[in-house]
Design a protein with these regions (language model features):
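A residue-level marker of the well-folded mature domains of exported/periplasmic proteins
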Residues: 26-340
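N-terminal secretory signal peptides that target proteins for export/translocation
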Residues: 1-2
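Repetitive helical segments and hydrophobic/amphipathic motifs
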Residues: 11-13
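C-terminal segment of classical bacterial N-terminal signal peptides
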Residues: 15-24
């Protein structure tokens, strides 16, 4: 009798554990809803490349999730904070991804919405930790590589860069570009200008034309206007997105920002919180993913490949290989660059 009772209890216990396991499995989330606060608009490579990364991630379906998102027009300050609060209070969103300097806004609400994972991006943010994650994007490695190319191809020894703002994650790639150029050509003269905006094509054209007038025969444009290069019939480099199609006769290659590993990291953190009960543990220090981790890359030369001399291409290819293998580490220099 006692044996029969014990077996019955064991059976009931096994059934209970089985039911719990089935319930836990059934409760795993199948949908992930993300609200994205944009800073410059989809026409800007900074914002446009993020949405492209989300589209690729949606196709890959990490953890079997159906990922959906909504995004705002460009918002800053109180307007951005108001939008984030509306998203949070709606109860419809699991992640609020604020795609620039928004830690001030997050700080005012992160404790109030502990189940929401907040993301801020780039320089100017504060590492709050907890349920705020700080994504950083550095593309100084491919910028160095195109500098190696430009340093060999320039005929005037004068190279120009038109940047957005003199921010930490802008300065790094400008300095890397010129360091790469000087690694193969110590006579390089650098010209630097900032449009003081995340996106202003007219100002970018003005600055680019001024640099060309001073003798720059190759331009690295972080500001996405290539018309002056077309008019001067010189080659240029684009930034953050593959912009060759915008100017096929001038954009030799583009430095690429790939947000895919960052998006997947955030999805994994949210998934662990939802399924394992792991506490959010947002980083308080800068974390970035370089070329070897898939966070940065370079676009092809396309039909302009024959413009690149074989010797210059060989040095360029070796530089990329050394960066990818870790044999060469590109110096991280965030000092504000100036013209010679």
């Amino acid at each position: 009798m006692k044996k029969r009772t014990l077996l019955s209890l064991m059976g009931a216990t096994a059934l209970s554990f089985g039911a719990l396991a089935t319930t836990a499995l059934a409760e795993n989330p199948t949908d992930l809803n993300v609200a994205i606060v944009l800073s410059a608009g989809l026409e800007s490579p900074w914002d446009g490349t993020l949405i492209e990364a989300f589209e690729r991630t949606k196709t890959e379906k990490p953890h079997g999730l159906d990922i959906s998102w909504t995004y705002t027009d460009p918002l800053w300050g109180d307007d951005a904070g108001d939008a984030m609060r509306l998203f949070a209070e709606s109860g419809e969103f699991d992640i609020i991804w604020a795609h620039s300097t928004y830690s001030d806004q997050v700080e005012k609400m992160q404790a109030e919405f502990p189940d929401i994972l907040f993301v801020v991006v780039g320089s100017g943010n504060e590492g709050l930790g907890g349920n705020q994650y700080w994504v950083y994007k550095r593309v100084h490695e491919p910028a160095y590589a195109i500098g190696v190319l430009a340093g060999q191809m320039t005929e005037t020894n004068t190279l120009g860069v038109v940047g957005s703002f003199p921010a930490d994650d802008v300065n790094d790639e400008i300095n890397a570009f010129f360091n790469g150029a000087r690694s193969v050509n110590p006579d390089i003269i650098q010209k630097v200008a900032f449009i003081e905006s995340w996106y202003d094509p007219a100002k970018a054209a003005e600055m680019t034309s001024a640099q060309i007038a001073t003798g720059a025969d190759m331009i690295f444009s972080l500001a996405a206007n290539f018309q002056p290069c077309e008019e001067a019939e010189i080659l240029c480099f684009a930034n953050f997105a593959d912009q060759h199609s915008f100017s096929p006769t001038t954009v030799l290659t583009s430095v690429l920002a790939n947000w895919d590993p960052d998006v997947n990291y955030i999805v994994d953190e949210w998934w662990a919180y939802k399924t394992d009960g792991a506490a959010y543990d947002g980083n308080t220090e800068i974390v970035w993913r370089g070329m070897s981790e898939g966070g940065a890359a370079l676009a092809p030369f396309y039909e302009l490949a024959d413009k690149v001399p074989a010797e210059a291409k060989a040095v360029f290819d070796q530089t990329l290989a050394d960066i990818m293998s870790g044999a060469f580490v590109v110096e991280l220099d965030v000092a504000v660059p100036t013209s010679d």
